[in-house]
From Swiss-Prot:
This is Large ribosomal subunit protein bL32c. It comes from Adiantum capillus-veneris (Maidenhair fern). One of its GO terms (molecular function) is structural constituent of ribosome. InterPro entries: Ribosomal_bL32, Ribosomal_bL32_plant/cyanobact. Belongs to the bacterial ribosomal protein bL32 family. The keyword Ribosomal protein applies. GO terms for cellular component: chloroplast; large ribosomal subunit. The lineage of its organism: Eukaryota, Viridiplantae, Streptophyta, Embryophyta, Tracheophyta.
Length: 58
């Protein structure tokens, strides 16, 4: 199994962690914005039924 030859520096570790955190924040903001548009009824990219049908037993 391959093993790295040198230890990762602290600065490189911070850079990688920072980019990972930024990506997660961007995704969470995007999903929150999408949820807001769906709940407010202004969404143009989703089609969903607005009438509620009662549960029917067969």
């Amino acid at each position: 199994m391959a093993v790295p030859k040198k230890r990762t520096s602290a600065s490189m570790k911070k850079i990688r962690n920072h980019s990972w955190k930024i990506k997660s924040v961007e995704k969470s903001l995007k999903s929150f914005s999408l949820a807001q548009s769906v709940l407010s009824g202004r969404s143009k990219s989703f089609y969903y039924g607005t009438e509620k049908k009662p549960f029917q037993k067969n």
